[in-house]
Amino acid sequence: MPIIYMNIMLAFLISLLGMLIYRSHLMSSLLCLEGMMLSLFIMSTLMALNMHFPLANIVPIALLVFAACEAAVGLALLVSISNTYGLDYIHNLNLLQC
């Protein structure tokens, strides 16, 4: 396995570990989630380039679209929670239920 794949997998695992450790604040969870999506995007792009299959180029673009949607929803929740409560704790997400 080339060293670049191991580095990207290590970046994904570090982001996953950060997501598990720093799960009390929404901002740190969003940053770890973005790190995971970035490493998945780079890995899928490298795989698509190595496969030389024309339809494989759609996968990184679709992943990038989902990452952008996830970031928009996450930032909207962050702004909503911080405007309402002044804090970005994840346990405040339960208070947004009707």
UniProtKB/Swiss-Prot annotation:
EC number, UniProt record: 7.1.1.2
Organism of derivation: Trachypithecus poliocephalus (White-headed langur)
Family indicated by similarity: Belongs to the complex I subunit 4L family.
Subunit structure, as described in the record: Core subunit of respiratory chain NADH dehydrogenase (Complex I) which is composed of 45 different subunits.
GO biological process: ATP synthesis coupled electron transport
Name recorded for this polypeptide: NADH-ubiquinone oxidoreductase chain 4L
InterPro entries per the UniProt record, alphabetical: NADH_UbQ_OxRdtase_chain4L/K, NUOK/Mnh_C1-like
GO MF, one annotated term: NADH dehydrogenase (ubiquinone) activity
Key word DNA repair present: no
Cited Gene3D superfamilies: 1.10.287.3510
Catalyses which reaction(s): a ubiquinone + NADH + 5 H(+)(in) = a ubiquinol + NAD(+) + 4 H(+)(out)
Enzyme class: translocase
Cellular compartment(s): Mitochondrion inner membrane
Alphabetic keyword roster: Electron transport, Membrane, Mitochondrion, Mitochondrion inner membrane, NAD, Respiratory chain, Translocase, Transmembrane, Transmembrane helix, Transport, Ubiquinone
Known function: Core subunit of the mitochondrial membrane respiratory chain NADH dehydrogenase (Complex I) which catalyzes electron transfer from NADH through the respiratory chain, using ubiquinone as an electron acceptor. Part of the enzyme membrane arm which is embedded in the lipid bilayer and involved in proton translocation.
Sequence intervals crossing the membrane: 1-21, 29-49, 58-78
Native organism taxonomy: Eukaryota, Metazoa, Chordata, Craniata, Vertebrata
